[in-house]
Structures are given as structure tokens and as C-alpha cells.
């Protein structure tokens, strides 16, 4: 299996990512050159004997100059099994001391990056193990609403996101400067990257999550939940704020929501909607359930997984 991570190693730009790059170098993961350049910088390769990992240095966050980076991504990494961008999280109302992994998509346009629930779950579980091992008791591991920073300040082409044929996630530390500068938190992130293919063998039931807030605790908890030999697979989460701004109550909203479902590897087995979601978006969830022939549940059912029926989407 092959994973690739895009990491800004420019100390003069941004947060978290260059610290992660330096930690990867310190711990010996960047000792081998991959033998080619990406936008003028030497790509690094690490193998654990079973899988290989490519670490790609960039001069700024990948999403902020996708037109420049995409040709190299397609040339060198179109055959990868999983990919990720290392960055930081910030926001006026964002929680602090978070270690996050989230799927990519532009809800306004309905362009969704490919998502792999099993690999994303592996990253979240590895992040949690590293959080515990490094004594990061003040932090918590979470996912968040699906979004993409490739559209910013009113500029950007979200259709570029779907041109990279590899599942991708953002992997972040947030959300305040004290967290960005926390070497231990960045070390937890760095060590997580080489465990994306570590698998506990559980049966993963893929969900589409509809509604809720950006850091929706019910969906975040589900992403780390397992029972017996089963677990939830959480990737795309369609936050309420962007359902509204994207006008998902309209016919075009159904098209965009279908594009979201179709981007999830293996399809979905259930739809979970936040109970406080407006009626028109609950109707959307039910329509999607009928279209894909999967059950639709309110978010409270996530607490009783043994009572849920799962059915692979058609």
C-alpha cells in the first residue's frame, strides 16, 4: 500500500506543518530520497517493509495553489491508496487543543474529494493512541465538517478537487497559537502518518452524516466508536451551516448530496441526520436513503449501534 502526505516545510509560512516535517526528519522518516522532485523540492520516501510512505515538501499549503501542484500530484501519486495534507486549524469559535482529521469537499459547488472511511478511521485511532502515549491529556481527537480551503477569499476552482483520484484528508492541530506551537502535539501528528494502514480488522459501517455544527460531537464520537467486531466509518459530514448556504433543499442540492455519497469508497450503509436539522434537510436525508436504499437514523441512535440496521448502498 502507498500513502502520500503533502507538508509545507517553509518556516516562513504557516504553522504546524513545518514542525511536523522537522519531527519526521528528527525521527528518521525522511532519510531516503524518493528520487524525484516535486515543484523543485526533493520528495522523501519511507518504507516499513509492508507499505511505503511519500513525504512531499511544499512552500505553502497544498490547497492554496492547487493549479500549480495538481500536475505533479497526478504525475507521481495518482496510484496512491491514501493521501493527506498536514496543516493547522483556526477559527473564531473553534475549540482549542484539538487533533483533527477531516474529509475534503466544497459543499457550495458539490465537489467532493474521494473519501476512504477505513483509512480515515485508522488515522483517527492512531492519533488517539499517540495522544495517550505522549501524555496530551488536554487534547482530544476529533473529526469535523467536510470542507476544503482551496476556495478562499472568493477565489479558487473547486472542480480541481475531484481531479485527484486518491482519497485525501486534512490532518491538523488546532486551534490557537499555543497549540500550533506545541511540539508534542505536532509529534503526535507526525507519528500518526505512518499508521494509516494499521487496521484492527473490524467491520466498518460507512455513514453519511447530515446536519450538526462544524465540530459536531455526536459525529466525532461516532468516528471513534466500536462495538464487538464492528465500527462506524465516518468521513463526509454535511454541516448545517453549509446545507443552508448551499441551498441543499433545492433539486440541485440533491444532486450535490448524491455526489457526496458517490465519493465515499465502498458506498454507505446508513445515513445519520442531526435531530435539530431543519425539516427540509431531514427530507433530503430521507430522499437520499430511498435513493441508495439505506436506512436513515436520527443522531441519537449512534449511542446504540447494536440496534441499528446497516445495508450497503445500491
Identify what each model region corresponds to.
Residues 1-165, 176-177, 183-187, 194-219, ...:
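N-terminal catalytic or cofactor-binding beta/alpha core of small enzyme domains
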Residues 223-241:
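Acidic, Ser/Thr-rich peripheral helices and adjacent loops at domain boundaries
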Amino acid at each position: 500500500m502507498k500513502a502520500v502526505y503533502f507538508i509545507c516545510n517553509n518556516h516562513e509560512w504557516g504553522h504546524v506543518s513545518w514542525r511536523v516535517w522537522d519531527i519526521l526528519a528528527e525521527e528518521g522518516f525522511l532519510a531516503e530520497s524518493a528520487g524525484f522532485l516535486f515543484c523543485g523540492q526533493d520528495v522523501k520516501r519511507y518504507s516499513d517493509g509492508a507499505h511505503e510512505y511519500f513525504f512531499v515538501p511544499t512552500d505553502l499549503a497544498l490547497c492554496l495553489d492547487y493549479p500549480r501542484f495538481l500536475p505533479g500530484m497526478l504525475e507521481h501519486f495518482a496510484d496512491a491508496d491514501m493521501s493527506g495534507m498536514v496543516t493547522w486549524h483556526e477559527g473564531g469559535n473553534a475549540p482549542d487543543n484539538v487533533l483533527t482529521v477531516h474529509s475534503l469537499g466544497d459543499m457550495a459547488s458539490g465537489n467532493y474529494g474521494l473519501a476512504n472511511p477505513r483509512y480515515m478511521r485508522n488515522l483517527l485511532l492512531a492519533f488517539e493512541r499517540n495522544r495517550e502515549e505522549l501524555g496530551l491529556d488536554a487534547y482530544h481527537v476529533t473529526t469535523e465538517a467536510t470542507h476544503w480551503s482551496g476556495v478562499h477569499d472568493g477565489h479558487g476552482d473547486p472542480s480541481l478537487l475531484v481531479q485527484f483520484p486518491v482519497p485525501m484528508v486534512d490532518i491538523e492541530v488546532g486551534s490557537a497559537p499555543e497549540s500550533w506551537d506545541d511540539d508534542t502535539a505536532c509529534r503526535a501528528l507526525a507519528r500518526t502518518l505512518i499508521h494509516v494502514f494499521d487496521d484492527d480488522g473490524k467491520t466498518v459501517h460507512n455513514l453519511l452524516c447530515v446536519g450538526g455544527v462544524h465540530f459536531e460531537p455526536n459525529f466525532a464520537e461516532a468516528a471513534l466508536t466500536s462495538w464487538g467486531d464492528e465500527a462506524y466509518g465516518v468521513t463526509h459530514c454535511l454541516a448545517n451551516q453549509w446545507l443552508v448556504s448551499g441551498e441543499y433543499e433545492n433539486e440541485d442540492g440533491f444532486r450535490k448530496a448524491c455526489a457526496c455519497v458517490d465519493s465515499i469508497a465502498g458506498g454507505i450503509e446508513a445515513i445519520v441526520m442531526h435531530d435539530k436539522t431543519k425539516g427540509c434537510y431531514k427530507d433530503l436525508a430521507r430522499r437520499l436513503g430511498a435513493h441508495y436504499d439505506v436506512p436513515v437514523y436520527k443522531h441519537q441512535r449512534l449511542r446504540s449501534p447494536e440496534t441499528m440496521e446497516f445495508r450497503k448502498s445500491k
